[in-house]
Amino acid sequence: MPQGASGFEHMYPHIVRWVQSYGWIEMGADHYSRSLVRALDEGGMVWESKEDDTTLDKVLQTLEAFLAQRIQEYYA
């Protein structure tokens, strides 16, 4: 992690790595999904939060765990 990294970068290093190197995340409501957060890459959606995940902190923790595994499997 770069020196002077923010609290977000320390709490969610795989989310940061994802958006800097592999894809992007979308947050909020849209017309196509009822999820709160989605992770995408060039091929499309790779993950979306469950409808019943109501807190952003819980969703980001779940996304962090998913991206840690995905980055290890596909990009390591």
Language model: regions and residue ranges:
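Generic detector of bulky aromatic hydrophobic side chains
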Residues: D30-Y32, Q72-Y75
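A short, charged, amphipathic alpha-helix used as a generic interaction element across diverse proteins
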Residues: G44, D52-I71
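Short aromatic-glycine-(Arg/Gly/Cys) micro-motifs in beta-strand/loop hairpins
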Residues: M27-E48
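Extended hydrophobic/Leu-rich segments
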Residues: F8-V19, L36, L40, L63-R70
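N-terminal targeting/docking segments
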Residues: E26-M27, V59
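Negatively charged, low-complexity tracts enriched in Asp/Glu with abundant Ser/Thr
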Residues: M1-W24, M45-W47, E73-A76
